[in-house]
Structures are given as C-alpha cells and as structure tokens.
Amino acid sequence: MARMSFVHLHVHSNYSLLDGASSLQRLVRTAKSLGQEALALTDHGNMFGALHFQKVCSAEGIKAIIGCELYVAPESRFDRSEHTIGRRYYHLIVLAKNETGYRNLMVLSSKAYIEGMYYKPRVDDELLAQHAEGLICLSSCLAGQLPYLLLQGRKREAEEHARKYRALFGVDNYFIEVQDHGLDEEKKVAPLLIELACRLGIPLVVTNDVHYAEQEDSVAQDILLCIGTKKNRSDPNRLKFKTDEFYLKSSEKMAQLFPHYPEMVLNTVRIAQRCNVRIPQPGPLLPLYQIPHEFSSKEHYIRHLVHRGLYDRYAVVSEEIKARADYELDVIVRMDFVGYFLIVWDFITWAKEHDIPVGPGRGSGASSIVAYALKITDIDPLRYKLLFERFMNPERISMPDFDIDFCFERRQEVIEYVRARYGNDNVGQIITFGTLKPKAAIRDVGRVLDIPLSEVLMITKLMPDDPKLTFKKAYESEQLAQMKQEPRYAELFQIAEKLEDTNRNTSLHAAGIVIGKTALTDYVPLYKDSKTGKISTQFGMDLIEDCGLVKMDFLGLKTLTLIQRTQNLVRRKGGKYTTFSISDISDQDPTTFSMLAEGKSAAVFQFESRGMQGILKRAKPSKMEDLIALNALYRPGPMAFIDQYIESKRDPGKIKYPDPCLEDILSETYGVIVYQEQVMQVAQRIAGFSLGEADILRRAMGKKKLAVMQEKKKEFAERAEKQGFDKKHAENIFEILIPFAGYGFNKSHATAYSVVAYQTAFLKANFPAEFMAANLSNEINSAEKLPLYMAEAEKMGLSIQKPDVNASEPYFSVCEGCIVYGLLGIKGLGEQVAFDVFDERIRNGPYTSFVEVLDRVPATSLNKKNAEIMIKAGCFDRFGVTRASLTAHLDDAMKYVARKKAVTSSRQASLFDETDLGECSEYTFPVMEEWSQRERLRIEKELMGYYISGHPLDEYRSVIGEKATLDLGHIENARSENKYLIVGVLNAIHPYTTKSGKNMAFGSFEDLHGSVDIVVFPVLWEEHRAQFLPETIMGLVGTVDFSKETPAFLVDSVIDLEQLRFAQVKTILAGSEHRRVSSGEKTPLQKRGVSQEVHIEVSSHVRAHAQFKSLYEILSAHTGGSGEVFLHMHVDDRTYVVYVPSCKVSATEVFAQQLKGNESFVQILKECVQ
C-alpha cells in the first residue's frame, strides 16, 4: 500500500492505567515498523501521556495526534445518582486539530476530574458545547452512546444523538466510528452504524481499539486487567477482552476489515492530515512578583534586600563578601531570574515570620551568598567554600532550583500562603505515577495466576530492595536466574517482565508545587487526587517546566519538626533556657563531638544507621567539616574511599595529592576527592577551566559517554599544557577525576544536611530527655519506630514514666528529667479524648479520682472504649484502684456519672435518693485482685509497643545475668564467628516455607536491653517448633549475622527456662552443633571501630568461681578503657569464647605484666594486646 495509507486514531497506552499494556515507546516504534507515519493517543479520560507521546513521536519521526477518550455523563456531569437505565458514562473520542483544540481538550480533561468525577472523570454535553472548537470527534467503540442506542433498538434516539453531535462539533468534525475485533456486538452494530452514517451524510472511519502493541501482548494485557479489577485469572466472572484483536494492526489488515468501504480507511489519513498540534513548550514563565512602589525595578529591590541582608549576616562586610554578592547578583540579573529569587524569598520570609521551621538549605542552592543574605538559606558559602557555579552556571542557562525543607506538620500552611498569594487557579501540585517494578510485578502477577503467596514471597526475597531494580539486574542473582528456568514459574516471569515499568497508579509528588503566570489550565491539563481532593498537573515532574510552569519543591522534613519540639521542651525548663534557640548553639560543642566519636548517633539525622555509627567510631569527627565529608562519603560508590579518608585523617603522612598544587583544594578531605565541587576546582586549577566550564565538564564525566569523554580528555590535557603541566600528567589527573565526577557528592547539600545533623546531635548530647521525648512524639503513630526509640531512651539511661492522667500530655513530655508517656502514643486511643483530658486538667486542675475524670471529660470523647484503653494503659493507677476493678466496674461507674449529670442538669434531686448519689468522688470501686504481672505487661505491650511498668524478664534478671553471654543492647559488639547464649522473651514467630518445601521460621526476640530478629532453620524448627510460642521466655544459642544492615541471630539450639536455671553455660554451649571455635583454635584480634579487644586464655584446670578471683581483681583495676574482654576457656578438649559484658579495660603494659604474673592459670593471647 502507499505510504500514509492508514492511521490508528483510537489508541490506549499504559497511561490508561491497568488497561493499556504498552508503553508509548513500544506503540510508536511498532507503528513506525508498520510503515505508519502518524499515530493518535487517546487514553481513557486523561492526557497523562500527551507531551511525553509528542516527544517520543518526534524522536521516531512519527506525527503525533493528541487526543483523549472522554467519559461522557448521560446527563449532567454534576449528577452523582445511579441510573437504572443506560450507563454511568459513555465513551467519546476527541482529537485536537490545532492549538485551540488542544487547549479545549485540556479544559475538558481538567473539568472532568475536578467537576465530573463519579467512578470516572466525566464531561457532559454542556462542557462539550463550550469547548468543541478545534476538536474532531469520533463516536467511539461499543461503549459509546451511539452504538449503545442502536444495539438497544432505539434508532430514533440514535439519529438524534448523531445529529446533535454533528451540530455540536461541526459538519466536518464528527465521524461515525466502526470497529471489528471479532465481537458479536460489533458485527451486529456495524451495519446499523454504516446505514445511519450514509443516511445522514456523516463520514465513517474505521479504528482498532488498541490496548497493546502486538497481538502476542494480549495475555499480558489480560493479566493487567485482573490486577486492576483485583481478580484472579481463574475467575470465570471477571472482566476480560473476548478476543486478542485489540492491537496495533497493519494498514493492510485494517483495510481488510470493511473492504467495501475504502473511505473508512482514507478518512483516517484525512483526519491525521488535519490534526496539526505541537504542544507549546515555552519553558518556565515566572509569575509576576509585585515589588514595593518605592523601588524602580525588581533588580533595584533585590539589590536593596541583599545589601541589607549582608549586614545582618556578617559582623564585618569585607570586600570579598561584597564582590561575591555582586558577582552572583550580576549572574541572576543577566539570566533574568530575579523574580524567582524574590518569589522564594517571599514565602520563606512569611514562613519564618509565622514560626514555621525552615531548613538551613538543601541541594546546591546553599552555595549562594545571595540566598544566604536573603535568609533563603542559613549556610555561609564562604565559610564552607561552596561554589555558586554549582547552583547557577553562567555558561549554561537553566532554571535555578531551590529545594526547601519545612516543618513536616506545617508545610501545608506555606503552600496555602502561596496559593493565596498567586491565585488558587495558578497553583497546584504535581502528579506522579507508580509503576510495576520487578518485585511488585511478581507479587501482582503471582496473585493473578493463583501462585501461593509463600512461593511468591520466596521469589521476591531473592530480589534486593532497590527502587532502580530491573529484571535484568535481578537475574544477576544465580538463585533467581535458576528459578526463572523452572517450568512452574515460566509464565510468571514472562508476563511480569512484559509488564515491567507499566504505570500502575497515580499519586501526588511528595514535595512538588507548580506556580503559573496565569491559570494552570493555560499550560497543562489538571487532575484531582481522589484521596486528598488536591489539584495537580496531569504531566509529571520532568515535563511541567517545559510547558511554562515554575516548579518549587516544598519538602516536609520531620527532623525540623523534631528540632522544634525539642527546642520547645528545653524552653519549658525555664531560667536560662527560656529563650533557647537552636540557631544560637555553638558548632564546636565538645560534648556533641565526644558523643559522635563514640558512635552514639542513634536518632541523629543522617547518622543513625548502624553502619554510620561504626564509621563515626573509627573517624572520630571533631569539627563540622568532618561531618560534612562523612555524610558525603557514606553512600554507594564513594563508600569505597572511607578507609583511605580515615587513615589519612589519622596519619597525615599517608595523604597523597594528585599534584602538589591541589593541596589547598583537597586538604580538608585529607587528599580524597569527596565533592563534585572539588572536581570543578581541580579542573580550574589544572586546565584553566572557568568554574562554569568545569561544571559542564563534571556533568559530561558523570554521564560516562565514551566519545564525549575522549573529546573532553583531549581538551583537558591541551589546556593543562598551556597552564604549564605535563600532558601525560594532566591525562592521569583526568582519569583520577572520572570516578569522582560520578561518585562525588554535592558539597552544598552535604553541608546543609550536616548542619541539621549536628543540631540534632547537639540536642541529644546536651538535652537527652527532651530530645528523645521529641523523637517519640515525632513517631507517635509509628508502631515500628516508637518501641525502637523507647529502647534507645532506656539505653541512654533515661526513665520513661507510664501514662498518667495527671501527668501525661497528648504528646511525650519531660518532667524532672524523666520522659512522660504521651496519651496519643496509646494504641487505639482517640485523638480528641487525649486533648480533652489534657485541656480539662489545665483549665480546672488535677483529677482526684477515676470517677471525677468521667465526670469532667465529655462522655462523647471519653466513651467506654477510650476509658477502657486508658485503664489498661495504666493512666489511672495513681488513684489506688486496680486495673482489674476499674475494668470490671466501668459500666457501673459510667452509669453513676450519667445519673449524677442528669440530676445536676435537671435540678430534680428528689427523683433520686441522695445517698445513692453523693459526690462523684465518693463512688467506691469494689476491691479486686490485680491482674498478674505477665497479663498486665502483655496488655501494655499491645497498647504501647513496649513494656512500661516492668518487664516479663524482671524476675529472671539473676538468671540472665549469670547465664547470658550476649546483651542484645550491645549486639554490635558481638563477633560473627562466636557462639552466644541469649536469654529473653519471644515476641513473634513467623513460619516460612523454603523453595525446596522445607519449613523454617523468622521471629523477633527481646531481652532486658534490646531486641533482635531471629532465624530458625528447618532442622531445629521441625524438632522444636512447639517451644517457639510468642511470649515464651527461653534461651537461644547461636551466632550473629552481620551481613545485612540490621544484625540477625541465627539459632542453633533452644533452651527452656528450667534447663536454663540449672545448666552451666559451658554445658549449654557444648550442646550446640556447628561450633565456630574448636579445640586448640586461637581467635585473632579483630578491631571494631577503634575499640580494642583483649583475649585472655584461661588454663584448663580453672573451674570454680573462686579461682577467677585474682583475674577479676586485675580486670577491675584496669577498667575505664576501650578494650573489650573475651575469655578463652578450655573444656573437654574444646575451646569456648565468652564475652565479659560491661567490662572494658585499658590494655597497657602494666596490665599485661600483671596478667603474666599469674601464668599458673592465665596467659594473654599475644596478638591481642597492642
């Protein structure tokens, strides 16, 4: 056939969520391979993919036709009633002929979401009439109103409908659409449509309702439908396409569908020729910022603000400071971004004036002295040697991008201010699309195929938790690659791969806000989020600025909320702390750096992971620059240089510079290239690049395109020669820079976030109770994090008081150095009652009895459910009535209070016997024995995720102290090759079936000091599963696995409580299999951080406790150091290593000599004392 012989005008991509199965790239490339020169995109009810589609078509040399398959309400789009006759909506294809049509299409799609949402985003005839100009309309598929009426036998109504739409869109712009996918209904309605079209003189057009690119994709699309409708493929009543003909057919196949009506095919070409839309992409257009009338221009105004700000920031404004500010202002003015800076300055100023915490900076924006003077950021770029060119490159004009952190709880207030400032119609949020990544694809497809969940989980556990994971990368796992070959899973993997990266759902970008110069619908179609009701763009983050909108990132950072909470609690201490401000703290606080150097950084922003705690112990940071470097290094890639950094920091003699002239650039990081800015500075120093050129070079290096790299290397070497460097030497330096250009971190961002990290560390070191109370409040709704922070508080030596109706506030608070449990932290307790109980106490004083609480707090708030929860949590223990009695007689007490209130209200005391009522406080609860401690604690754990008033292990403290060889609060000090006995309570156990069909289990175990995940392997699980019951107190023997971020305990054997009481540790350890230390083995010293380990070998004849007395005396005399003590004990031709908890010694020569003086029963393993 001749070129441009047919065009597909009814096409759905995977932006028709969980319906269309093919990506835009696949559809366009398939059309191109078929020799088709144009293609339409008509996704269901949306324009999500329109601009992306245009870009893909341009890249492939295909003409893009922008359209949409609208949903049309049967009557008004505002009507939400159920229609017993007809449908909730009908389909209608509209295509944009020109820019007017495209703008009308945007309005239709936007209003469908904002005004017409009812199951689907709907328009109505009123809207179509208002916005029909520039549009071509097709009557659509079987779901269209015209085919529906004809199939119903309502020919007169069908004719009226066709006439109405022809009049509405115009004689040349309305087409009757005919399809044939092999469906009975289509064969029945096609002649009726043809007859009607011929009779009315309406042109016909043939389409295929494309839902996937190729016929072979029909199975994947069928599975996708099942995912969307939450059905299994085996369900006979599920929604499904009845044939596999809904693909992008060749022109020849489309011509064969209705061979007697060739004009149907020809009309597709004519329509395509009439549709000539290029979506406008003007780039970001700044909204107008109104300056005060006394200033002649925006430039005049910003220079005034910056000049004033410099004198606020600096005690002395030097020539260097003025020059840097003038340089930046000149660049900002030349690039025409003054308005952008003023907009950002305006809403940040408003936020600070309204006491909304704002972050000190984020990203490269922290490198600007103009931003610092305007108080957009709080990072001095001169002090930290930050480069403005990393933020705004004068040689590469692009929109600056301030990412701004606000208090998590008050971020929305700033957004509302911006909305009020620039107009509600001009401000919106940004849509994002969730896609089927490998793990999600396996889970969803596995469910649809009826594969047991245990098997699906077994497969997904073989995939790393990486948001950028692809199937290709996942198959690098040998186990997963083998599993893919198993016939049982062949279809699962085949379909999951085909659906990889398919759009699955929409949501709102966590931070993105857009501002338009005029209404957003002048630039992009809009979407209304069904969960929040918030308005967003239909185009994603990467496309909106092309369309003319300005993007801002308003991030909600919980850490700012944490700092604010802590600051408020500190101020409540009174006295000198009344005016305490985090902005006034010293950045050289020795207490803070001492804590960090010990690795005690749990709950410290950016430094709380176990891995980072270990790095801190080794690196011993002593200044802010150290924190910045560690923050930048502790990431995939640069992490490989941490050892070099630490060694060079410890021993300056090991520092090596690529060239001596680079010392001033690299000295702060001890010769290691850590930051992107250092790459730029090296290029400037060696090759004479301007910083703008150096930034372009850095970006090119990061992309690692071979041809570009070779060209840049040549340029670098040639320019270095002109600077007086040897060419070969310059090429070597270029090669050194390459990995760092990719790995190197943005110093501005590392600096800003390290400042926030330091602030949290300062608060933890100096105000531990307030800091941990604030952390607990921050995570008050997190069942996972709340217990972790409570455990950390306990590890820090802080006391946590149980909830108390006369002491607790809604959030966690501090009283006399103790943390008081917050009412909102009690699981299931309503928010309203927490505030009502507190507010009433503040207004009218403490409560004197439980009944008085019921009397004073509204019953609508403190209902039976909430009262029972508070009883069980211990809120009323202070009144001397057992929780058992309060619970058992709660109904009676509530009835009593209700009667009392009725009497007081009606003033008809005579209706009741006064002796029955009296005063509320006189109500007496019958005496009842309290619940057992175990039951009381079980309920506390259930309600608060933690044991508050005690611990189930309290009565076993002596046994644990005597028998346990590992304290879970210090599990990081364990050694993976050693066997340990832990004693505690089993919190949870989860059976699991391996791929080979064997049963094992995972669980959670807790002792008095911490908790750990445990792994019980098949043999042990089969033999002892009856012993692994939740809340059982037991001993476990095994090893610690450090292969993951969080350590796990691999269980070798289980010891019940009675065995534990009477067995000796050596017997318990000897009874376990797979011993790590066998007879005669010596365990060498292994350093953990900078701490030392002292291994002492005990002679085989030493047995009784008394025989260790002299050894204990020596150890006690040398405590206070960093050497952790391990005893190597010989029993029955085996060697056991026992860790001595809470004993750290100074391994001096005196210590060694004293031990050697007792050679009759002890010797030091020589390699262990240094």
From Swiss-Prot:
EC assignment: the record states 2.7.7.7
Group of enzyme by EC: transferase
| Family matches, as InterPro entries | DNA_pol3_alpha_NTPase_dom, DNA_pol3_alpha_thumb_dom, DNA_pol3_finger, DnaE2/DnaE/PolC, DNAPol_HHH, PHP_dom, Pol/His_phosphatase_N, Pol/histidinol_Pase-like
Q: Name one GO molecular function term.
A: 3'-5' exonuclease activity
What Pfam families is this protein classified in? DNA_pol3_alpha, DNA_pol3_finger, HHH_6, PHP
Q: Where in the cell is it found?
A: Cytoplasm
Q: Which GO terms describe its cellular component?
A: cytoplasm
Q: Which UniProt keywords apply?
A: Cytoplasm, DNA replication, DNA-directed DNA polymerase, Nucleotidyltransferase, Transferase
* Function description: DNA polymerase III is a complex, multichain enzyme responsible for most of the replicative synthesis in bacteria. This DNA polymerase also exhibits 3' to 5' exonuclease activity. The alpha chain is the DNA polymerase.
Name of the protein in question: DNA polymerase III subunit alpha
